[in-house]
Each structure stands twice: as structure tokens, then as C-alpha cells.
Amino acid sequence: MEVKVFDNDVEKALKILKNKLSKSGLFKELKVRRAYEKPSVKRKRKAIEARRRFAKVQRRRSS
């Protein structure tokens, strides 16, 4: 991933980079891969994520 620095404003470039990384899901992936995840825990996490996505879609449809 690449971020351009304008006017030597490194703080703003870091903020943009962090935003891009979080939107791409890299931070979440790093957190998951930090330690071994048992298959049962993995299934449970995936089910919770799917439920959240479904609820989000339902909220958008009802609005």
C-alpha cells in the first residue's frame, strides 16, 4: 500500500495510511492471525460476523 506525503506532512500521511489499512481489513486480519485460533472458536467468530453483516443489510433495506 502506498501513500504520498505532501508538504512534508507525515502525520496526515500516517492518518491516511491507517485509514486505508483499516478499510482493507488488514488490522483485523493481523489480530486474528496473532495467535492460533481453535476451529470451534473460528466457526463461532465467523457465525457472529455473518450475523452482523446480515443485520447491517437488513438495516439498510428498511431505511
UniProtKB/Swiss-Prot annotation:
Source organism phylogeny: Bacteria, Pseudomonadati, Thermodesulfobacteriota, Syntrophia, Syntrophales
Family: Belongs to the bacterial ribosomal protein bS21 family.
One term under GO cellular component: ribonucleoprotein complex
GO molecular function: structural constituent of ribosome
Keywords: Ribonucleoprotein, Ribosomal protein
Gene Ontology annotations of biological process type: translation
Protein name: Small ribosomal subunit protein bS21
Keyword Ribonucleoprotein annotated: yes
NCBIfam families in alphabetical order: S21p
Coiled-coil ranges per UniProt: none
Superkingdom classification of source: Bacteria
Claim: Ribosomal protein is one of the keywords in the record: yes
